[in-house]
Amino acid sequence: MPPKKANAAGPKKGQKTRKREKKNIPYGAAHIKSTFNNTIVTITDQQGNVIAWASSGHVGFKGSRKSTPFAAQLAAENAARKAQEHGVRKVDVFVMGPGSGRETAIRSLQAAGLEVGAISDVTPQPHNGCRPPKRRRV
């Protein structure tokens, strides 16, 4: 067996780390993907380049707790805080998916201090495409 590395987590001494540059982007878009298992909040600029992101799992929830509205709220607050460091003040919101964290994430973006412009649902709707999974019998 090969020997384990001593410090696998962080950069070594003398090694330069890339410092995250502060961008000044006043207007962006918040993409909220809310599935049955998780909620992912991504804040981008108008070209679609990612400024900040957070998810229920990234915030610290595991398993079925990731799909709760409270986890979505914390994820949205976390992403909004990171985006405000880059100067984002106003966002358009694009919501995708059937999950339980949709409305909560939008409300917490507003509560975090971001001004919400338009809200649009971009959930893909099949024109009778793939066969859905079979019904659960409990």
Swiss-Prot record:
GO terms for cellular component: ribonucleoprotein complex; ribosome. Residues 13-22 have a biased composition (Basic residues). One of its GO terms (biological process) is translation. PROSITE patterns: RIBOSOMAL_S11. Coiled coil: none annotated. InterPro entries: Ribosomal_uS11 (IPR001971), Ribosomal_uS11_bac-type (IPR019981), Ribosomal_uS11_CS (IPR018102), Ribosomal_uS11_sf (IPR036967). One of its GO terms (molecular function) is structural constituent of ribosome. Pfam families: Ribosomal_S11. The keyword rRNA-binding applies. Keywords: Ribonucleoprotein, Ribosomal protein, RNA-binding, rRNA-binding. Residues 1-23 are annotated as: Disordered. Residues 1-12 have a biased composition (Low complexity). Belongs to the universal ribosomal protein uS11 family. Located on the platform of the 30S subunit, it bridges several disparate RNA helices of the 16S rRNA. Forms part of the Shine-Dalgarno cleft in the 70S ribosome. Part of the 30S ribosomal subunit. Interacts with proteins S7 and S18. Binds to IF-3. This is Small ribosomal subunit protein uS11. It comes from Mycobacterium leprae (strain TN).
